[in-house]
């Protein structure tokens, strides 16, 4: 019989079940065949559908019965409280930036670029080619595919000045995303209970990784030009820290880019204290009116541990990043990484390498820069018109975000709730601070979907701000 016959039987038996008691026995297959004038195959198909829907259950050798619904007994997990003890970190395990959004909201909260800004054609073609190659069925080297190691090393080498030894492919460790790399770096180079200096504000994922690694996070104030050198030097002196985590180019959330002079001063401080600088170049591919200039390119003495991700610029489904470290530090990181994930999917590595070595990749990046500038400027213009109370200290030259200070005493958590109720998602700035926030901030992503909705989104934010201020 056809599919319609099976569906008809399912519908009729459901009506019968609705009037039957739990545990009631259904007519036999032979009876159902006769009643519905269908073949045994069609009847069995209908019964399988009802079983999958949880309406009936079969007891071999006995028959088929209406399934009895059991009231679920509440589970008691109280014993785990004593077993787990205190949580290792009080930070939430997920950021507002990771929330999924429905199509009927205006989303400024996300930490990722919209699908329209991704090289979709290149990604699909790369995945197809990778699936046909050896990478689909073979285990890659623990440190990564040699060709991908070479690409990452060459990318950093292009910024290396004369007189500085460029990195070698052997200095590269490929990672399953930068988040995993940060965790390995903090565990391998800092260690549980030891001090770690971080910019404040700083990337929430780095703060989460630090908390999970059990390190003692010490904030260093940072502004549009980078961290305060005197405060950084003092933090090293007082804490005895041997590692400073920072984002010199288009920092998340502020969008700040260090000046060349500030970068050199920070590097001198790090070297003087015999410490490491972990340079997170997360926005390398998101330059708008300036390009990322890695500080690691100026260091060949192993003080700078450089990490770069392709996840946001290639595809969130291709979680590939790399860390470039020289000397014993690389081995420490490699050991910590191996304990977490023994190797990175060769299929994803091959696909990522395919994308970034295609001629269309550079063409895509040029177009991406123009699109980001257009979106950034549209959102800034809309905010100036509708939310004049939000102060933008500087216009980011790259990255994905605007970092806005609200008036003193403003409740940004309440603002996020009010905006969400009106169909706009924003991110409160509190989660980007390693300690108490220095003021009320919000972060808005201008790389999100539907830029045509930016003016309306800004209008809704402005209305919520005015309501809270009583204007």
What is each PLM-predicted segment?
Residues 305-385, 393-394:
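PLP-dependent aminotransferase class I/II
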Residues 57-58, 391-397:
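Short beta-strand
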Residues 198, 219, 279, 352, ...:
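Hydrophobic residues in well-ordered beta-strands that form the structural core
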Residues 1-128, 338, 344, 356, ...:
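N-terminal basic, amphipathic alpha-helical segments
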């Amino acid at each position: 019989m056809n599919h319609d016959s099976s569906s008809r039987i399912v519908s009729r038996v459901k009506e019968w079940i609705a009037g039957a008691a739990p545990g009631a026995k259904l007519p036999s297959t032979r009876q159902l065949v006769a009643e519905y004038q269908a073949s045994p195959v069609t009847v069995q198909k209908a019964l399988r559908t009802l079983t999958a829907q949880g309406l009936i259950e079969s007891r071999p050798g006995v028959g088929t019965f209406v399934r009895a619904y059991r009231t679920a007994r509440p589970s008691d997990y109280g014993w785990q409280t004593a077993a787990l003890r205190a949580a290792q970190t009080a930070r939430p395990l997920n950021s507002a930036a990771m929330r999924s959004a429905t199509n009927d909201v205006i989303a400024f909260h996300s930490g990722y670029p919209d699908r329209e800004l991704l090289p979709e054609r290149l990604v699909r073609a790369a995945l197809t080619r990778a699936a046909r190659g050896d990478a689909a069925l073979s285990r890659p080297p623990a440190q990564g595919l040699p060709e991908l190691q070479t690409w990452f090393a060459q990318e950093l080498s292009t910024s290396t000045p004369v007189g500085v030894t460029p990195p070698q492919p052997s200095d590269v460790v490929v990672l399953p995303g930068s988040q995993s790399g940060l965790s390995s770096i903090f565990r391998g180079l800092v260690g549980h209970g030891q001090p770690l200096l971080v910019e404040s504000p700083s990337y929430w994922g780095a703060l989460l990784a630090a908390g999970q690694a059990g390190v003692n996070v010490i904030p260093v104030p940072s502004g549009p030009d980078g961290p305060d050198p005197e405060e950084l030097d003092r933090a090293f002196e007082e804490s005895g820290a041997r590692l400073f985590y920072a984002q010199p180019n288009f920092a998340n959330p502020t969008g700040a880019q260090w000046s060349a002079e500030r970068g050199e001063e920070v590097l001198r401080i790090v070297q003087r204290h015999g410490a490491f600088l972990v340079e997170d170049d997360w926005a390398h591919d998101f330059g708008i009116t300036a390009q990322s200039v890695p500080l690691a390119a100026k260091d060949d003495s192993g003080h700078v541990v450089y990490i770069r991700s392709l996840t946001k610029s290639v595809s969130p489904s291709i979680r590939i990043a790399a860390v470039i470290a020289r000397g014993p530090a690389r081995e420490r990181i490699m050991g910590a990484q191996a304990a977490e994930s023994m190797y990175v999917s060769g299929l994803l590595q091959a696909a990522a390498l395919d994308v970034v070595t295609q001629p269309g990749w550079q063409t895509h990046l040029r177009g991406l820069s123009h699109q980001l500038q257009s979106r950034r400027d549209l959102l800034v213009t809309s905010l100036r018109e509708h939310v004049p109370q939000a102060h933008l200290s500087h216009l980011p030259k790259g990255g994905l975000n605007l970092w806005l200070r609200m008036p003193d005493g403003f409740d940004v958590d309440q603002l996020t709730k009010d905006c969400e109720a009106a169909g706009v998602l924003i991110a409160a700035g509190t989660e980007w601070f390693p300690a108490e926030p220095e003021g009320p901030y919000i972060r808005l992503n201008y790389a999100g979907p539907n830029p045509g909705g930016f003016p309306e989104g800004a209008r809704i934010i402005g209305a919520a701000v005015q309501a809270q201020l009583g204007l």
